Amino acid sequence: DSRVQDIKRYPPFAGLESSQENVRFSYSIGRENKTNSNGWVDLQPVNNTVGPELSFARKVSKNITPPIAIIKCAAGGTHLGGDWNPDEPIQFKMYPLTLNLVKSSLAELDQMGIKYRIEGFIWHQGENDMFEENYMTNYGKNLQNFISKWRRDLNIPKLKFYIGELCTKTIWGMDLRPRMYAISEGQRAVTKTDPFAEYIPTAHIGVEIGNPVGLHYH
């Protein structure tokens, strides 16, 4: 992610500050004070931030004919073992929050008579779990359970999951490399045994530039 005003510093991101009218977007972003779309809107930066969904959607849209839609639920500093736990969510209770967002967003499409197909689930998280010993050592097990519950709750047994690699090039990654590695190993273990889950290498683009941060990636 980066700030809209910084886009001009990074030519590959040129134009992402503008709305993508051909892409539908439903979202709930933040911790205590969430920013919600309250329905489907054009894909655009939220809170002056350029999220990964913007470049992702532009890339996909250039390579397929059908229109796409993205549902995003995100909050920084959350744990898979806690906030995102599908069985006993704590604190920000991200799993039930996201499930409700997905169901309400899809229901709105149904009401509008729009046909759709859920293509996949993108998951990029894990840094905060390394600070809790139990969460860190059980990350793979928790991720496997997380994936299983999503497939059950959406009634899509073969729902595809794309698990983004964690970056070890930032300050967190350098100082806490063994713990980051433990999380990554848990992710890799799941994708090696699940034919519908794929591990997506991203560390080659990991970077943190500027003071304050201009282009930021964990």
Write out the residue ranges for each language-model feature.
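Cell-envelope and extracellular/periplasmic
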Residues: 1-218
